[in-house]
């Protein structure tokens, strides 16, 4: 997870710019600001940003200091899962579970990227571990610790943290020590702690006057609670209402077709699906063999814990109709790895005594190999021989397991060794290849994907583009069984990254602002482009003492400029450029006070729609937050009004040195604004 960690550069520049701001300004860190100007906040909880900011303060902000905490989170998740499984199922299952999680492609991906998901997964695993400790000790403090971990996860990625909550509650109520009334009371007490930790920071933000804090990024009413339960809540599941549908991720069409087989879809399967059949068998078998165990049996309890967690995540991820990214599946990677390990170890032990268990093991290995064969086929040209090796190994393992029940003891030993080696290849051959491939190329933007270039969808690596779909129906196998669809080689429409983004400095990444790109979004993905060095040099040399280097529309434009220059940049409108902050009055005040000389228009996605609100004037206040207005939808757009004011009052500049004209990166224009203009 740590090897070649900086290959992705600043990765998602939306979070990178916020982390850079947090590393330089305690105020920006506390308010979870999206940049050094502090007009708009991130659209997620503050914890991941704080982690990156603290690391930057200690090590100096860089790609390494930003991504190192993510890698540490990934390693700790593996370690904690190992201890959780060891306490309940023994050392062998623990080692297998840790290995499977470490080789799960989506886990490797998020552990090397600056999205909040690595920290989220760590806190969810830690909460599950604390519940196991509560079952062991019977002490309330472990239950409270579990609630604290979930609350911290809520401060990382809001309601997604609660995917683990049903599993924690059900497990303690079913298998916890003591009478039911006592268990209910303790669960209620933990719930109170959970609520307090979850909403402590968000509640504090809402007590601060809107004029003295950043505007809540991607909200429609400048409310953290509206963002939590709207755009990042109901609309993520229903696909309707609650926000603009963008935020730190882009669009709703990135995650395949909703339905029970969504996680096997061509666009998602390579991230998480490898072990799903084995995990399902492991859950069913584990509960069956422990059907007569005492209520407090830890072995059954951990199956309930991991099973409810995985099933809850499967249901939400499979049927959510709002914005979806394949890396969201990292939230269920730990329970899937744990259940798959439990199934493997349990079936191997049971197969020695019962023929029907041997048959179940053989079938599970065959199914796992067949799925890996299909998933590997989604990456044309990627070690094409491996899929046949995996399929052959699965068949060999299945035959060896079945033959072991009818041959003599001497031959059985040799078959057992052959079955073990073949089973290992069948189970981990595919995901480990995808995991290793993830280490080998950089990615950028808001929708990274694990695996080799050309698998699934999106773009990654220099000058390359991922495929939107790979052949699902034409080659048979799991394509037909698990609903895998789409013509081979079909690419997404030109509307930004189809997935993984581009490596910094690649042809695809040189699209905003400047470089040699042909315009924003062809492969770089939102939050993944590099700043034009010529533009940055011009702004630096013509800053003339201004507090802010430039104001730019949307974080995908402003973020790279701030990262390249290290100077405060105003992100007009937040992530998509649609947030009503700063207001026109605030922008005018900044120009009048000499705190801002240049504005870069274009590149955001507010269009002509935008969102009204956020009136008032803060002049050059560092945390204008829209001037206290509550935002909301309106007939007039603040983003359009900002653009109209700039084009009316400021002078277009060609920073390449030609005569004044509406010049700049493709689709963008740089304007010079002076105090006399205001």
Question: What residue ranges belong to the model's regions?
Answer:
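Membrane-integral, polyisoprenol-dependent glycosyltransferases
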Residues: 1-359, 367-370, 437, 484-487, ...
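C-terminal region of N-terminal signal peptides and the immediate post-cleavage residues
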Residues: 3-14, 115, 119, 202-215, ...
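Sec/Tat-exported extracytoplasmic proteins
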Residues: 23-27, 232, 268, 440, ...
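Structural recognition of the beta-strand scaffold that forms the well-ordered cores
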Residues: 70, 120-122, 162, 226-227, ...
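Disordered, low-complexity segments in secreted/periplasmic proteins that are enriched in proline
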Residues: 218-223, 227, 232-259, 435-540, ...
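Transmembrane helical bundles and short interhelical boundary loops of multi-pass, membrane-embedded
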Residues: 354-458, 522
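Membrane-embedded, lumen/periplasm-facing catalytic core of multi-pass transferases
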Residues: 376-389, 396, 529-549
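Extracytoplasmic
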Residues: 555-595, 643
């Amino acid at each position: 997870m740590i090897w070649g960690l900086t290959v992705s550069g600043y990765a998602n520049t939306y979070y990178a710019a916020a982390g850079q701001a947090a590393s330089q300004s305690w105020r920006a860190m506390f308010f979870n600001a999206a940049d050094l100007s502090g007009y708009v906040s991130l659209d997620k909880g503050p914890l991941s940003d704080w982690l990156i900011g603290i690391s930057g303060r200690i090590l100096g902000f860089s790609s390494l200091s930003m991504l190192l905490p993510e890698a540490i989170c990934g390693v700790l998740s593996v370690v904690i899962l190992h201890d959780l499984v060891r306490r309940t199922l023994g050392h062998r299952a623990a080692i297998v579970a840790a290995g499977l999680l470490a080789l799960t492609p989506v886990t490797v991906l998020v552990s090397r990227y600056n999205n909040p998901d690595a920290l989220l997964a760590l806190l969810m695993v830690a909460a599950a571990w604390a519940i196991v400790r509560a079952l062991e000790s019977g002490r309330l403090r472990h239950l409270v610790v579990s609630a604290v971990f979930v609350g911290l996860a809520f401060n990382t990625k809001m309601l997604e943290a609660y995917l683990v909550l049903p599993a924690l509650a059900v497990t303690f109520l079913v298998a916890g020590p003591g009478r039911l009334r006592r268990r209910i009371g303790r669960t209620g007490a933990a719930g109170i702690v959970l609520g307090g930790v979850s909403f402590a920071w968000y509640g504090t933000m809402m007590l601060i006057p809107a004029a003295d804090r950043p505007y809540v990024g991607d909200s429609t009413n400048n409310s953290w609670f509206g963002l939590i339960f709207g755009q990042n809540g109901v609309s993520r599941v229903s696909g309707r209402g609650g926000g603009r549908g963008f935020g730190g991720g882009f669009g709703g069409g990135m995650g395949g077709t909703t339905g029970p087989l969504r996680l096997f879809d061509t666009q998602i399967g390579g991230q998480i699906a490898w072990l799903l059949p084995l995990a399902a068998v492991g859950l069913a078998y584990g509960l069956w063999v422990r059907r007569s165990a005492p209520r407090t049996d830890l072995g059954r309890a951990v199956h309930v814990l991991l099973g409810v967690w995985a099933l809850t995540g499967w249901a939400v991820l499979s049927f959510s109709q709002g914005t979806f990214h394949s890396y969201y599946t990292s939230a269920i990677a730990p329970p899937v790895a744990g259940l798959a390990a439990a199934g493997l170890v349990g079936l191997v032990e049971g197969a020695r005594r019962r023929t029907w268990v041997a048959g179940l093991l053989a079938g599970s290995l065959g199914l796992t190999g067949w799925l890996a064969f299909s998933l590997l086929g989604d990456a044309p040209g990627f070690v094409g021989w491996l899929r046949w090796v995996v399929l052959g190994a699965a068949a060999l393992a299945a035959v060896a397991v079945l033959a072991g029940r009818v041959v003599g003891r001497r031959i059985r030993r040799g078959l057992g060794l052959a079955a073990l080696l073949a089973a290992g290849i069948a189970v981990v051959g595919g995901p480990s290849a995808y995991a290793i491939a993830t280490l080998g190329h950089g990615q950028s933007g808001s929708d990274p994907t694990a695996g080799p270039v050309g698998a699934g969808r999106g773009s990654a690596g220099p000058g390359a583009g991922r495929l939107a779909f790979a052949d699902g129906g034409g080659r048979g196998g799991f394509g037909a069984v698990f609903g895998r669809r789409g013509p081979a080689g079909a690419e997404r429409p030109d509307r930004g990254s189809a997935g993984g983004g581009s490596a910094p400095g690649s042809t695809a990444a040189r699209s905003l602002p400047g470089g040699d790109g042909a315009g924003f979004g062809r492969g770089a993905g939102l939050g993944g482009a590099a700043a034009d060095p010529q533009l940055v040099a011009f702004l630096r040399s013509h800053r003339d003492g201004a507090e802010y280097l430039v104001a730019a529309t949307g974080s995908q434009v402003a973020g790279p400029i701030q990262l390249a220059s290290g100077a405060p940049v105003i992100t007009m409108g937040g992530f998509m450029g649609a947030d009503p902050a700063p207001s026109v009055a605030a922008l005018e005040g900044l120009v009048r006070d000499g705190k801002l000389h240049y504005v870069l228009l274009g590149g955001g996605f507010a269009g002509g729609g935008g969102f009204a609100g956020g009136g008032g004037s803060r002049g050059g206040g560092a945390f204008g937050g829209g001037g206290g207005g509550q935002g909301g939808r309106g007939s007039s757009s603040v983003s359009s009004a900002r653009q109209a004011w700039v084009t009316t009052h400021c002078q277009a500049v060609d920073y390449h040195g030609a005569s004044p004209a509406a010049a700049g990166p493709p689709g963008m224009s740089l304007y010079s604004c002076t105090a006399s203009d205001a």
